[in-house]
Every structure is written in C-alpha cells, then in structure tokens.
C-alpha cells in the first residue's frame, strides 16, 4: 500500500495536546504504490506520542511530522529512504512556530538515499526548537541535519559510521531569490498566522520573539541558539558547518570524538556503553537501549526475529 498511519489532533492556537498515541506497531514495506511522501507514520497537530514502533524498508521517510510538543521515543528505524534523495528517516520543516518536539532514545540505522542522499533526522528549511537526545545513529549518510533552524538541541547521542554526524547550515541568510521567497514570504506568513508574542507561544517559546527584528531589518535569519553537546562520534565524520552558518553561532561542547567509547559489542550493533566507558567522564547519560523497539503485550504475545 501507501502510507502506514496518519494522525492529527490537538489545537495549535492554544497548544492543547491531543495525547494520541501510536505505539508498538510494526510498519514495513510501505510506499509501494507512491514511492515518495507516503511515510510509515505521518502526524500533525499538538502533543502526540510515537513510541516503541519498528519501521523499516521504505523508499522515502519513516516519520513525517508537523506541529508542536510531539514525543518520538523508543522507535527502531532502519533501511529507510532507499529510493529517494534530499529526504530524512525523520522529517519536518519550514515553520518557525512548530516547536517543542522531542526525539529521544530512537535507533536509526542504514538509511539509503540517491542524489542528494538522506538524513537520519532532517530538520529541513529552518525547522527549530527540536530536542534530539539520547538517540543512536549508525550508517547514516548524514545523521542529524539542521537546515538553517534555530534553538535546536543535539545532546547525548551516539553516532557510528555516519558522514557526517551533524551538519548545520545557515540557509536563512542566503540572498538568492528562492531562499528569500521561502524565508521572507512563506515562513513569514506562517509566523504571522500564530500570535507568537502573547501566551501560550510567548511563554512556551520565548525565543520566537527574537526572529521579528531580523524581518524588520531585512537581513535574513541566522541559525542562532543551536546546541551540540555531550555526543559520541565514533568512526564517523564529525561536524560540517557551512552555507552561511559559522561555528561562532553554535554552542559545541563536551563531545567525544576519535576515542573508543567502549561499546558492549559494536560488531553486533550493541551500542550500549561498558561501565568503564570514558564517555561517562564528561557527563554522558546511559541510553536505555534495552527498551527500544517493539515489546510484548496483550496484542503482541511473542517477538519474532523479524520484530527486532
């Protein structure tokens, strides 16, 4: 068929959460008819929880998201984006106000891609205010891609054999007409459609008010407020910053590179850290690897090899 699960709910004006949940599903071989933009899971609105799903073997994205305050956790995504380019296993983009989303404790590996390639987590066209915490990325072309966004947090992740682990650009500053139309027209209209200077947006996302002066000055929007901290990069190219972005705009701290983190069994893709791992010395927090993926419940009474 085409896409797997589509979900919307909640109120973006008031940031009222729907509290819908997509949990413990095995989604595979989707996008069979339409090869692009038919993800395993598509969600919109406010406050959904996407947990403990196994999603694999799709030609395009596994999860596409829009909206606010979604929690994406304990999912296992692999062999995604096999027939497309400029795509992410997880994808969102092009709205300053879609913030407060959290991706934590997911395992993403073996993303494919043609042409421009693929990303593990793709924050496209200035997607902002997203937390990427405690995930494991292995064999991803680009593991985390921040395309001009602001106030994103990349923390406590493990990157193995990715090229690069993190890439950040400043496309919001590009003077070319195509980017000015996207930033100054499309994204400005979406920003103005939300009353971001009054609650709940002004209190929940105070950084939004810092964007308005840049529009007044007509100088483009820089990728400020991004944080890359306490990550492990092993066997990977580490960090690429370019296309109008500068390292001075980004907080980069306490990351471990080019040192063996002492995985339990790298060859078996068991990326739990041994108790004597040097990563703990700079404050790295244990990732609950044993909780990632499907689990046994009243609907799933056994886990087959294909469920892991």
What is each stretch, according to the model?
Residues 273-301:
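Active-site and glycan-interaction determinants of carbohydrate-active enzymes
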């Amino acid at each position: 068929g085409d896409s797997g699960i589509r979900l919307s709910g909640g109120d973006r004006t008031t940031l009222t959460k729907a509290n819908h949940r997509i949990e413990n599903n095995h989604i595979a071989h989707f996008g069979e008819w339409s090869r692009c933009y038919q993800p395993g899971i598509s969600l919109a609105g406010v406050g959904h929880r996407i947990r403990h799903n196994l999603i694999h073997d799709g030609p395009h994205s596994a999860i596409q998201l829009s909206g606010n305050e979604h929690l994406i956790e304990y999912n296992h995504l692999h062999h995604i984006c096999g027939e497309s380019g400029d795509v992410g296993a997880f994808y969102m983009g092009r709205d300053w106000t879609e913030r407060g989303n959290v991706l934590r404790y997911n395992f993403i590996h073996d993303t494919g891609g043609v042409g421009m390639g693929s990303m593990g987590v793709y924050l496209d066209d200035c997607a902002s205010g997203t937390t990427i915490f405690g995930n494991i990325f292995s064999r991803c072309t680009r593991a985390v891609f921040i395309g001009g966004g602001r106030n994103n947090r990349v923390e406590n992740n493990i990157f193995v054999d990715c090229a690069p682990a993190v890439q950040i650009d400043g496309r919001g500053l590009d003077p070319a007409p195509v980017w000015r139309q996207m930033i100054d027209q499309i994204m400005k209209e979406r920003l103005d459609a939300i009353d971001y200077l009054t609650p709940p947006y002004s209190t929940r996302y105070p950084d939004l008010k810092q964007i308005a002066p840049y529009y007044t000055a007509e100088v483009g929007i820089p990728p400020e407020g991004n944080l890359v901290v306490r990550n492990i990069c092993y066997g990977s190219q580490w960090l690429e910053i370019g296309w109008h972005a500068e390292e001075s705009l980004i907080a980069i701290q306490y990351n471990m590179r080019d040192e063996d983190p002492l995985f339990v069994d790298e060859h078996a893709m068991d990326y739990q850290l041994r108790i004597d791992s040097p990563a703990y010395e700079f404050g790295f927090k244990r990732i609950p690897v044993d909780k990632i993926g499907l689990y046994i419940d009243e609907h799933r009474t056994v886990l087959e090899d294909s469920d892991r």
